[in-house]
Amino acid sequence: MDSKGSAQKGSRLLLLLVVSNLLLCQGVVSTPVCPNGPGNCQVSLRDLFDRAVMVSHYIHNLSSEMFNEFDKRYAQGKGYITMALNSCHTSSLPTPEDKEQAQQTHHEVLMSLILGLLRSWNDPLYHLVTEVRGMKGVPDAILSRAIEIEEENKRLLEGMEMILGQVIPGAKETEPYPVWSGLPSLQTKDEEARHSAFYNLLHCLRRDSSKIDTYLKLLNCRIIYNNNC
């Protein structure tokens, strides 16, 4: 690797280390949102939002880095993007088209959408980690990010359930969420088709993590800061 490539890699590693240390200091990474369980949560709504916003932003950063790494390693010149457009398993969710539409959406709807997106990714993230582990020559940068995203997605889901309970006391999220059915594509013996399936999944993860991050920041601004941010 040339000196420029080494410098860029070193910068990325330093950035990840700084972010990880920041999250650890804030009690976000490796610590449950409510250490004593959801029924004994003493964390304020403001703190819940602060932690959730940090985790969602972190997940989106990891998702973008993982997608870019996979694209560079496996997708150059393959045209996978044309097959990935509008083919996410969460496309059936009626999400706002852009930030402006999201700003006009009621906070209960935004919370329901965030919860639906997070729950819909539990299964694919589990299988993503399993299948990436079995790939030949997969970069550690992809596997480590996949593992971390799966863990952080669970923590963010827990945090959002706590937020829902404080914003709407007694509320229970019962809305159905999209079910992923793409495992056979990740396990096919056709390497080209398998790489295309991985590309599509990572593309969708990056897209949905961006939506979650946007909606959560809007909710934080609206509920905690009364839109004064």
Curated annotation (Swiss-Prot):
One of its GO terms (cellular component) is extracellular space. Interacts with PRLR. Keywords: Disulfide bond, Hormone, Lactation, Phosphoprotein, Secreted, Signal. Belongs to the somatotropin/prolactin family. Residues 1-30 form the signal peptide. Prolactin acts primarily on the mammary gland by promoting lactation. One of its GO terms (biological process) is negative regulation of apoptotic process. Pfam families: Hormone_1. PANTHER family: PROLACTIN, SOMATOTROPIN,PROLACTIN. It comes from the Eukaryota. Disulfide bonds join 34-41, 88-204, 221-229. The keyword Coiled coil does not apply. It is found in: Secreted. The modification Phosphoserine is found at residues 56, 64, 120. GO terms for molecular function: hormone activity; prolactin receptor binding. Its main location: secreted. This is Prolactin. SUPFAM superfamilies: 4-helical cytokines.
